[in-house]
Amino acid sequence: LSQNKQKLAEKPMAAVAVGFGHQGGKRKTSEAVYITEEQTRTEIKDTRISVSITKTATVDSYTNAELRKKYHIDKYDLHPGYVFPESVRSLIPRNTPEYVDKGFNYVERIVRALYYFKQCALIGPSGTGKTHIVYLIAELCGLPIWEINCGLQTSAYDLFGRYIGLGKENWIDGQIVMWCRNGGILYLDEANMMKQDIASRLNPVLDTRGHIVLTEKDNEIVHRHPHGYLVISMNPFSAEFVGTKPLNAALRRRMSVWINFDYLSVGDKIFPDEVELIAKRSGIDKNTAEKIVRTGAELRRQYKNGDLPYGPSPGDLINWATLIADGCTPIEAAVETIVGTTSDDVEVQAVVKRIVESVFSSS
């Protein structure tokens, strides 16, 4: 005896989640989940009875819809009419905090570049939110993200795939090949640290050919998914970033759009929204928040001039402010946060501490 039953139902359930980002933020999202289909199957064989229930749900995040309007990306649908397979939906980011910029419309510009050209490049110093914004875009556009750090230890086998065990029976796809097959955003972080052999193998998939040849797998040709997008990010090529080198010329030509990132506040230029951000997310008063931002701006200036190895991100400043809100003095909190974050070198830490003391000793 075999019985199959299908029924349609809608059952809303509320869910609240919290996420964190490079700007130290956390965003609560209120989501409505609707059960759109329920399948029940009952089988009786001999004296055994088995029952299986399969439920399919769709999630509608009101917060994300509002953010799409806020960032002016409603008109750019990066996967029209296409639903990503269940196997990769877990790679779609959730609860990514909003991104605060200086009116440069980074989100809109990146989404527009992906919509028209399918790939773009982000360049800027550490702590300016390049990775944060890519994750935010992936969430707002409903795209799985495949992140690869292009360090010198990353091998072609990790990215394209390899056989495991003896013989040629068990092949495992690498990250890039899985992206080609499934779509989404391939995010190559620290792209100007990429090995030359890896960069050259990417060229065919980024131009009109649109495919990768797996020489390790009997020259199998894997075509790029129609909803496969590429974002590369990098720090500026300089001596401070060990391992960086000028980006491969062929790869550079295939990046249709280049977007430059910078810190919110640098030197004497203090961005009021960053002060508001620090005060709001840590709970400290605006006067203390302004001093924290001024300290961060000076550290960033010295970093950009090559005098310090790191410039603090807004998230670093919020960590500092959070300890102050908990009762630590500004100096104590700085020693536990941005002083240690900047460098392990005792002399460099002393320089950072002096900058903190000079800002907080002023009226």
PLM segments and residue spans:
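C-terminal regulatory/interaction module of P-loop NTP-utilizing enzymes
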Residues: S2-S363
